[in-house]
Structure formats: C-alpha cells, structure tokens
From Swiss-Prot:
This is Cellulose synthase-like protein E1. It is a multi-pass membrane protein. One of its GO terms (molecular function) is cellulose synthase (UDP-forming) activity. The keyword Transferase applies. InterPro entries: Cellulose_synth (IPR005150), Nucleotide-diphossugar_trans (IPR029044). GO terms for cellular component: endoplasmic reticulum; Golgi membrane; nucleus. The chain crosses the membrane at residues 29-49, 64-84, 526-546, 553-573, 644-664, 680-700, 709-729. Its EC number is 2.4.1.-. Keywords: Cell wall biogenesis/degradation, Glycosyltransferase, Golgi apparatus, Membrane, Transferase, Transmembrane, Transmembrane helix. Its main location: Golgi. Belongs to the glycosyltransferase 2 family. Plant cellulose synthase-like E subfamily. The active site is at residues 152, 443.
Length: 729
C-alpha cells in the first residue's frame, strides 16, 4: 500500500506559475446579451398581444384556444429565460501540462479508474476490454494507476475477457509508451492505422486479433475455454454453480498487481462483481460505484478517481494530466471537486442523424455552467477527488489517507465484505457518502450535492477529444435513453434535492437556472405537444392563432422566430456542425420533446402516485449488420413497436393531413387566406418537412428498419379520427 511519505509534493515548490488559466471572451458575450435582450422584449410583446386580443369578437372555443396558446407561450418565454443562464458567462480552461511535469515529475497522486458494465450481451466483452486497455495505457506512471472493472452482470465471460486483456496488456502498454500511441484503445488504433502498420505494430495487431478471436468465440459458444479455467482457477472458483446475474456472491480478483515494489510495468487491474440478492435492492450503477469506492480504498486508494462507461475509451492519453492541472493547482484548484470532460462518440454519422453529440451542449452550455460554478457531473469522463465524493465538505481538513491506515496483506474476504449487499444497511452510503441513490440520473444529483457542500467543478473540452464512446444507432435507443434522462432530471426537480430550494444560498443563481434547464426537460414536453397540435388543427379548421402578416403585431412573432432560428443555426455551425446536422438536431429536438420527455414526465408522475418504480435501462452498444449499414447511410431506423413511435406517427400524420387540407382549401380559394393564416402555414409546413424521414418509414420503405405496419395503421386511424371529429365541431 501507499507509504506515509507518499504525499503529493511539488518537485519545484518555488515555481509559482499556475497550472491552468481561465479565460473569458467579453466582446462576444456582450453582443449576445444585447441580442438576447432584443428577443426578450419581443417575447414580452407577444404576451401583451395575447392578453389584449383574448376577448375580441371570439367564440368560447376560440377564447379557450387563445388562452391555452397564451399559457404555452408564457412557458416558452420563461423557459427561454432559464436557458440564457448557460450562455451569459462562459469560461474556457487552459491547462499547462508541461508545468505539471516540471513541478511534480512522476510524483503524482494515485489514480483509480472505474469502468462499469452490466450486461455482456448489450455491452460485448470485447468492447469492454478495449476500454480497459485504453486506460491502462494512459500517460501516467503505471505504479500510480489502477483500473477496476465493475461487472454488475456477474458474467464469467466478462471475467474471462478481462483475463485475456491482462495478458495482452503486457504487450500493449509498453508498445503504447514506446511509440506514443493515440488512441490507446487497440481496436480504435489498429483500425485507424490498418494500411500503414510497421513490423512492431503488425506483431501487436496479430496478438490483438488472436485475443479478440478467443473472446468472441467464447461469447458465441457460451462457454469458457478449459485452459483458462485452470489458469485463473482462483477467479472462476468464486462463481457458485447456481449463480445468476441477479443472485450471486461478491467476486473479487486482482489480475495484475502493478503497485510499487512489483516488477510488472503495467497498472493494477482488478475485477469486481458485487454481491446481488433478489431480496436486496442493488441501486443500479450508483450501487456499483459505491462498492468500487469501498473496495478500491483497501487495495490502491487513489486520491483521484476517473469513472467511465464501458464503451468510453481513452482517445487522448494526455487528458489525465490536463485534469490534474486543474485539481493540483495550488491557488484555484483547491476549490475544484471534480473535472468533467464531454461525452463524445466515435460512431456518429457526418450529419449526426440522431443528434447524439449534443454539440451546443458541450461547446456552449457547459462553458456557461462552468462560469456559474461548474458543470453537471454526467456520469462518465469525470475525475473526482475521492474524499469529496465520499462526503468531505469544502473547507474541512483533508483526512488521513485510508491507504496509510491499512495493512498490505489485508485478507481478500475482508475486502469482499465491503461489496456485500448488506454492507450499506444503517450507513450513510447512497445518502451522505458516495453516489446518491433513488434517482435514474444518480450522477447529476451527486454532482449537485457536492456543489451544494461548497465545492466547484471545472469543465475541460480539449481539441483532441479525451474519451469516445458509442452513440445510439437507432431512433428507439436514442428515445429510450432520453426518456430515462428526462425522467431522472424531473425527479430531481420534484425532490428535496431540487436545485431551486436545495441549492438556494449554496450555489449561484446562474447555476440553479442551469440545472433547471435540464430538470424541466420532461414538463417542457406538454407545451411543445400542445403548440404543434393546436397550430395544425386550427389551420385545418380555419381558426387564426397569430396576427395578420400586415399587422404590426406580426413583427415580434416574426422576429423571435427568425432570430432564434438564425442564431441556432449559426451557433451549431460555430460548434463544428453542418447544415444537415442542424436540421437533424431540430428533428430530434421535436421528437425528444413529444415522445421521450412526454413519457419521462408521465413516468415521474406515476412514480409520485406510487403506480410504478424507476428502472435503469442500459443502452445497447451493438447493432445488427443491416441496421448498421442503414445508420452509416443516415437512414432513420424504426423497426420496433413502441408507444413513443405511436405518438410520433400520430402527430406526423396529423400535421400532414391538416396541412394538405389547408393547401387544398387555399388552392380552391375556399377560405384560405395566407395573410390571416400565414404563420400557421409556415409552422405546420415546417413540421411536415421535418417529418419526411418519418413518412418514408411509415409509407414508402420496405426494409426491416421501416415503421412497423401496426404502428402506421394506428397512427393514421388516430390522426384521421382527430381531423374528422374537428370537422364536425
């Protein structure tokens, strides 16, 4: 274990240069503030218009519709104000890793990396070990680095894959160090260099292919090679004959011990599958993280912890030193609890078909959150101080390191007890210690409580992305993922940890509003749904909802629409996107709010009423071959029956029928007045155009990725029924 003199001391203490710099771009921010002020003035004018016109020569139905539109536009305006908090004070962090090297040399703090997986089918073992191998080769002293794999599936196959990775690491890590390999994931590196490998790389590639073949063969056959069971008998013997993924004891195996005093020049590598029993709630990923915190404290006890999802491989091995520049800075770093990197992906199509990158979020909004006190903790790509995530408040003295109080030869059974399903009973784990329980987005609520204890966080988004993962490759996966996020964020809003009252007086108003941007995703579904439906139905019925184009009151409506759209496009292009990418982003904005967020809202309400419980849904990391080809060609994938698809299909067909009826009326000259209904034509027309991939999937395509016929029929019937009923009102 760590000796008492193994403290982090600067090699050159007289060197007072900061390890990072924080910069602001005041000119651009001031210009944006003027722009946002002009938009807000027009929003207020829209409200005044709605109030002033609500009683003018209207039927009861007209007044009701007008009032609903007014309420919805109040929500849009107030939510827009909330979103400005993440744009008014952006900051950029610039680490100086060369200064870190001069000041500390190799005397860096111990770093424990937590990689979490839960299902060997959805998260293939070969993908998992590529992530593990990528972090074993980080630009960091190997004796100070430990990698822990938490396998919540309790899979022998995953353990076998890790044993293979441990053997391959003996070749891979020295190779990476010698040739400065980037990225350090074998699969990513070898695929990027497939046509230009030298002899050394060819030998490594051969060993990797052999390892991959053994792992994939074991996965396909569903059994572990007998020689592996013999070689790693201590590990495999920990599985009971009747063990299942939901019912098994703690399995702990140190596959590589790379601590000081050992001859192996690769990091420590540990496998952990915590105990699970049907009668005990396991608290999903949060429970796995807390088990890792306790177990690692008795093995390596790194002062810094990096946690990664099993698909997020290290793309930039220098990112670790960049994070330490923030955390070890003698002046400003002492108030930073965690450093968050963005969640980026290596399988996103050129035009980001499903809006997975969330470009504006990582390149704009998180910079603004950083300026207000720090970004959210998003559950992956984050460097934590161990004592802070375990409960230390800002200003409290740092406790003696756990590793200084424990013995080298602590019995494995004593360590395994820390991962038992009963260990946390009558303790503060999941409450005041570790990752919080009781919420589908345990990461966000954990980061919020850390910041409310007086700490700040920092955001780093280097030019070379630090970590890359696997984005959803079909629409259903994306919607399910967003449903869980929106549900969890809304649960936070309604809980005792709501940033509005829990954060009051503890974090800045700007950061409170920044959290509210995400916590209000779910309820924002209702105004969007109402607005899109009412606009189309009133166009169908010939009821005007907006001022005439010739009226001066049209100006604020037109300005807000054009200005917001133009700025959104410019912002997206500035973030490195394409026009088609922006258009795809707008489509996903609509789909998320009318399906994922809507169901997230309903799930939260049902949970509050005691009707249902939250569930943690794992996003699949692989796709079948035909679906993968369609994804590469940017063809939208439906393929499964889903209530969310039924909502999207019904709304899409409703927009189409209403627009077609209005155009027919306009062409025939029977009550179609563009001057009166112009804005409704534009809004409904845009909805029809943006839904073109949906219509293709429902009506034109014949491949397996099309919309299921049952969903199409139900959608058409529901949309026609709505139009028919409205026609007789």
């Amino acid at each position: 274990m760590v000796n008492k003199d193994d403290r982090i001391r600067p090699v050159h203490e007289a060197d007072g240069e900061p390890l990072f710099e924080t910069r602001r771009r005041t000119g651009r921010v001031i210009a944006y503030r003027f722009f946002s002020a002009s938009v807000f003035v027009c929003i207020c004018l829209i409200w005044f218009y709605r109030i002033g016109e609500i009683g003018d020569n209207r039927t009861v139905l007209d007044r009701l519709i007008w009032f609903v539109m007014f309420i919805v536009e109040i929500w849009f305006g107030l939510y827009w104000v909330v979103t400005q908090s993440s744009r008014w004070n952006p900051v950029w962090r610039f680490p100086f890793s060369d200064r870190l090297s001069r000041r500390y040399g190799s005397d860096l703090p111990r770093l424990d990396v937590f990689v979490c997986t839960a299902d060997p089918v959805i998260e293939p073992p070969l993908l998992v070990v590529n992530t593990v191998l990528s972090v074993t080769a980080l630009d960091y002293p190997p004796e100070k680095l430990a990698v822990y794999l938490s396998d919540d599936g309790g899979s022998e196959l995953t353990f076998y894959a890790l044993t293979e990775a441990a053997e391959f690491a003996k070749t891979w890590v020295p190779f990476c160090k010698k040739f400065n390999v980037e990225p350090t994931s074998p699969a990513a590196y070898l695929s990027s260099k497939a046509n230009c490998l030298d002899s050394a790389a060819e030998e490594v590639a051969k060993l990797y292919r052999e390892m991959a073949a053994r792992i994939e063969t074991a996965a396909r056959l569903g059994r572990i090679p007998e020689e592996a069971r013999v070689k790693y008998g201590d590990g495999f013997s920990q599985w009971d004959a009747d063990a299942t993924r939901r019912n098994h004891g703690t399995i702990l195996q140190v596959l590589v011990d790379g601590r000081e005093g050992n001859t192996i020049a690769i990091p420590t590598l540990v496998y952990l599958s915590r105990e699970k029993r049907p009668q005990h709630h396991h608290n999903f990923k949060a429970g796995a993280m807390n088990a890792l915190l306790r177990v690692s404290s008795k093995i390596t006890c790194g002062k810094i912890i990096l946690n990664l999802d099993c698909d997020m491989y290290a793309n930039n091995s220098k990112s670790t030193r960049d994070a330490l520049c923030i955390l070890l800075d003698e002046k400003e770093g002492k108030e930073i609890a965690f450093v968050q990197f963005p969640q980026c992906f290596d399988n996103v199509t050129r035009n980001d078909l499903y809006g997975s990158m969330m470009r504006v979020g990582i390149d704009v909004e998180f910079l603004g959150l950083d300026g207000n006190g720090g970004p959210l903790y998003i559950g992956t790509g984050c460097f934590h101080r161990r004592d802070v995530i375990c409960g230390r408040k800002y200003g409290e003295e740092e406790e003696e390191e756990e590793s200084e109080r424990i013995h080298e030869n602590l019995e494995p059974e004593m360590i395994k007890a820390l991962a038992s399903c009963t260990y946390e009973e009558n303790t503060q784990w999941g409450k005041e210690m570790g990752v919080k329980y009781g919420c589908p987005v345990e990461d966000v609520i954990t980061g919020l409580t850390i910041q409310c204890r007086g700490w700040k966080s920092a955001y780093l988004n280097p030019e070379k992305q630090a970590f890359l993962g696997v984005a959803p490759t079909n629409l259903h996966q994306m919607l399910v993922q967003q449903r869980r996020w929106s549900e969890g964020d809304f649960q936070i809003m309604l809980s005792k940890y709501s940033p509005v009252w829990y954060g009051k007086g503890k974090i800045s108003l700007g950061l409170i509003l920044g959290y509210c941007c995400y916590c209000l995703w779910a309820p924002s579904s209702l105004p969007v749904l109402i607005y899109s439906v009412l606009t189309s139905l009133c166009l169908f019925k010939g009821i005007p909802l907006f001022p005439k184009v010739s009226s001066s009151w049209f100006i604020p409506f037109g300005y807000v629409t054009v200005a917001a759209t133009a700025y959104s496009l410019a912002e997206f292009l500035w973030c490195g996107g394409t026009f088609r990418g922006w258009w795809n982003e707008q489509r996903m904005w609509l789909y998320r709010r009318t399906s994922s967020f809507l169901f997230g809202f309903m799930d939260t309400i049902k949970k509050l009423l005691g009707v249902s419980e939250s569930a943690f849904v794992i996003t699949a990391k692989v796709a079948e071959e035909e679906a993968a080809e369609r994804y590469k060609e940017e063809v939208m994938e439906f393929g499964v029956e889903s209530p969310m698809f039924l909502v999207l299909g019904t709304l899409g067909m409703l927009n189409l029928f209403c627009f077609a009826a209005a155009v027919a009326r306009l062409v025939s000259g029977d009550g179609g007045d563009l001057k009166t209904m112009g804005m409704q034509f534009v809004i409904t027309g845009v909805l029809v155009v943006i839904n073109w991939p949906l219509y293709k999937g429902m009506l034109l395509r014949q491949d397996k990725g099309k919309m299921p016929m049952s969903v199409t029929v139900k959608s058409v019937v529901l949309a026609l029924s709505a139009c028919t009923c409205l026609a007789f009102l």
